[in-house]
């Protein structure tokens, strides 16, 4: 495990338990709040243009094919500071971070275009805009998490010690965790008052309400074991069926970094092997400039190798698999050398 990933893993564990004292920075560059605010504004403008394009063409691919074909939606992400030739495409958006999101009629056209762009001078990478899905164990829809109990993490006693040490919750710093998922049920009694403003990248608005349930479940799991100083930043990237696209997810990951999240949770995945350069880029930049830690699911494909899933296979992410009540690997969880840690699931 490289030094940066080791630091990220240690920091993620610390953030899970709401550390009292500030964590020492391992950032590589200085970025001001004004820099982040301007970049965030440009990001949302780009997200709006992307939304208009994806909404128009989203019905032209079959979501059922998404878990086997990275090019299922006929769309690619190209990184280049140069102008590109969009011949053969039906739509495109650009103008942020040198990203060009290009739409084609079929998955095969998109695949061939990506291969061709890889040969173009000045292109850093060309890869599919992968369709992603929520990672969930069927039938699990509760907020009280057994993994925080006395036989496991023992969060209650830890939090009692934390409160005693700090002299009250009012002395703890606010810790923001971005949940990049299906949204947030702001009316749920367990979640009321435990969030900061987020964004809906699916509908392109500032109201990330959950119309699926998975995101609220993940948020509830995080809040279960933490004191009230921990708040959720809900970033909706998956629709009512639990599907989304890499382009919006990458933008949400950067948005979390730019807007003060200490950590981000992504319980979602898609097929990608090594087509993950955009994820690698945004994770590295977020860690270097804003000290954010990205915790990602290994995936729930019943023992598959997590290295074939995005963003689980991004080296600088903390990749989390699941174990059961007997502290054995959960049968639904993905496995492999890319996994950094397991958690109750």
Residue ranges with predicted function:
Residues 77, 125-127, 176-179, 220, ...:
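Structural recognition of the beta-strand scaffold that forms the well-ordered cores
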Residues 139-233, 244, 248-252, 258-263, ...:
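Active-site core segment of subtilase-fold serine proteases
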Residues 26-140:
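Primarily auto-inhibitory N-terminal propeptides
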Residues 189-191, 210, 235, 322-345:
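Catalytic-core environment of secreted peptidases
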Residues 4-16:
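Sec-dependent N-terminal signal peptides
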Residues 213, 225, 235-316, 326-331, ...:
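Substrate-binding/access-modulating region of protease and related hydrolase catalytic domains
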